[in-house]
């Protein structure tokens, strides 16, 4: 009767079976032996009685059915008493009840497929009832024949094994006893067929055989259907007769059912005992199988991996598997599909039969648990298949499928699998659904990592080639994906929780995997990233899944960083890499140094078609979308951002710009610990970035949008430390590549900050002396922006935001206005803090927080609300930046960098001027409080950034295109420099999104500093899509910094942006106001400050970047750690390098890369 309980949901579906069983169980439930009671109730209980009794007594019956007599009276009074005595006299009633349970289990088998698929009510009840009932009657008849022999054995087994193994046995017993019960029911059904036909219409239940057996009772039992499942199989035949008589004599059901009850009791006894015997045997088998299930699943996973690698059929099988798994996950949308999947599950030896319902709601979270469970068999099979799928995708089939799924299935994936939503459908990306399921399940990712490591680097080349071959077709698919991404917005809303669960589970697992990976070495890292990325590839193929299912949030970051840029890079391999030898060298470089990185890149390239366009479109749409929509699509946001970026990428600025930088980013992402290796790779990539340099900036910005969302998801997951460390690992890697661009961008961005046409050299000379000038200068990081410093002495903190304050289009720039003032007040104290930070980053981060809190009273009011969330983020960043000198902090800080990139993006958007001190201090606090940090706030902040970025990006992309590739490159470089600097501050993620936003916000300023030399590698990095935003005239200096004169329109845009951003982000606006500083005052101050901070905040941004320079210098020894400060160093050193050609400690490699890139 526990059987009935578990089956209760199914029985609820089987209203007839449940109704009749409820009637029997209602009488039976009190006595615990539901069979006798059920038969009695079926025999003499009226329909109403059955309803009443089943409602109350059914639970008891479920609990156990041995004590039938005591509660039989309760169930049906005197009739129940008679029945109870009848049943009591014959222990067969327990067996009969067990048989009924077996019948109901048989029904469950029918139902369970639906139930396993997460569709309890999925199957049409009325239609299937007759068919199921007929088959059930046949099986019951055969059971009835065999009951006599095994009656007593089954009774004993029933008492012993049935209750023990009702859950596992019910399926087996259902399967085994199905024939017996069907035969028994058939014979009984023939008797009660005339009566059964009446209820047949009433029976909507899945189990038609049982329905027929219960059909006489079905009309009233429909209401009870949920309760009587357990005992129903027992009395199915008897009930059919008794219920038929009851249905006929509903007014007086007790009269007719009594003979029926006697007959049905005997029949149910026989069938139930046969059922019990079979069920006990099956239970024993199932208990054994349950133990074997895990190993079997693991073996099946391996087999599926191998088969998936070998066969495309694996795709289809995982397709079905993932389909039913997804159906389980999305019980609402794919119940029918779930029914199919449950059949698939049953087909699978490891079928998820027990845990299918679990997977339904929390499939992603449960998947990892279920992998350990027998229910995970199908999941693991599916995951293995999807793992194998990535392998074929790695290989030739990976090229084919990667291209196909990227082009055709990725949009579907975005719709169905990327969301992991109930909106999952068996589409072209059904295998990608398996990917999605796989990727959320970190075990599958890890399995891929372990099993696919060897395969993926080799197939990576094939995949790269296939991606290169299919990249352009994918770009149109990117648009499709964007449309689907929009459709996903609604889908993601329902599945967002699963995504968060996936993030929590997958992010932690992938964090562990990535953490394990990065220490292992570049190749191991690469291998793991290959496997993860192929796991992600499946997910990434529907980029929104990777983004939406940040379960593999680190993979998301990987795909965000590497994927977005590498998508661009792959696309740019086709488009931008004009020289095949260069492409070959870059690809070989990737494949050697980042063999798996390249696979990651390609994987991400695969998914960025949806991912980048999603990002750019998400960025562009985020302006359109409300804050709530962004929150809804946050899981999507990485997908949307990547999609959006990819949309821009088809504009080929992204395609050209992102190729090399994503590679560097991916290399860095893959081997954050292997900074020397990665640095060499980065240098190679920096050199290779020269041709494709412009793209990485945009790619970086897109990546940072993705990382932003990933950070938000990580924050939502509450594993900010792991995510941050991973993110920061990746971020410094990306920051290094970003630094390559950011170096130029820094000089450029310094010019950008120097909207006052302050030459980049001036800014960069101070930037070179940043740590030196930090102590001396009132704006410690204003060393880069001494001229800007005059306007925003406190804005050196915003050195990262140099370009950002230039353009109030950036929301963070509006915040930067507040932060600019705050930092202007704070900068004198913060300058010392910056110098100290270079010496004692943690200490100074605290000081920065204090300075932010103490020095700027006026600005603090505005900055502090931002700081409330952003202080946390900034403190996180500061902690990560200050602590990432420690290798362990490196990972944490890398993850924090990702997170902080997110938060820094938000922070930068909020108050880029206070970026260096306020942002870092706040990030420190935020890192500490990131888990408790309001996810909504961060989401809104990230949305705010994205929104700002999206319109600006679109405009600047168009303008960048208009302004020409070099200017675009130059413009994007400042953006990427800002993003790099911000990434240095916020980890490299921010440069893309925040810098893009800032650059977009003040493209004229930001892009003005960009030097034509930087356009090569930085060209499209962040600014290209946004360079169009610059309304100011660009006066490109051949030396490299392009002086941008911000026009009044741009300033108006700045002013517009802050209120627009706040208004576009009502939730963010509210949260900011709620955070302690009114957004209104922020907006007004932002408007004022934007006018001031157009130049003044440029200085502030420069200051922030300069602040990072000391930290970068301080962390120079840790550059190999690829800590956020490594990226900071890379970016800061890059900036001084472009300005002075100096190398700051470990920044030398990055600087060298940037020099060569330049």
UniProtKB/Swiss-Prot annotation:
Q: Motif LXXLL motif 8 at which residues? A: 819-823
Q: Does the keyword NAD apply?
A: no
- Give residue spans, biased composition: Low complexity: 548-560
Region feature Interaction with ZNF366, mapped onto this chain: 1-415, 753-1158
Q: Where is this cross-link: Glycyl lysine isopeptide (Lys-Gly) (interchain with G-Cter in SUMO2)?
A: 111, 170, 195, 198, 372, 508, 756, 802, 850, 901, 931, 1105, 1115, 1154
Q: Give residues where Phosphothreonine occurs.
A: 207
Positions of the region Repression domain 3? 735-885
Record-listed Phosphoserine modification sites: 104, 218, 356, 378, 487, 518, 542, 564, 671, 807, 1001
Regions of compositional bias (Polar residues) in chain numbering = 406-435, 641-659
Q: Where is this motif: LXXLL motif 2?
A: 133-137
Short motif (LXXLL motif 4): ranges: 266-270
Which residue intervals make up region (Repression domain 2)? 410-700
Motif LXXLL motif 3 — list its residue ranges.
Answer: 185-189
Q: What induces it?
A: Expressed in a circadian manner in the liver (at protein level).
Q: Which UniProt keywords apply?
A: Acetylation, Activator, Biological rhythms, Isopeptide bond, Nucleus, Phosphoprotein, Repeat, Transcription, Transcription regulation, Ubl conjugation
UniProt KW Acetylation keyword: yes
Subunit field text: Interacts with RARA and RXRB homodimers and RARA/RXRB heterodimers in the presence of ligand. Interacts with HDAC1 and HDAC3 via its N-terminal domain. Interacts with NR2C1 (sumoylated form and via the ligand-binding domain); the interaction results in promoting the repressor activity of NR2C1. Interacts with CTBP1, CTBP2, ESR1, HDAC1, HDAC2, HDAC5, HDAC6, NR2C2, NR3C1, NR3C2, YWHAH, JUN and FOS. Found in a complex with both NR3C1 and YWHAH. Interacts with ZNF366. Interacts with RORA.
Question: What is the recorded name of this protein?
Answer: Nuclear receptor-interacting protein 1
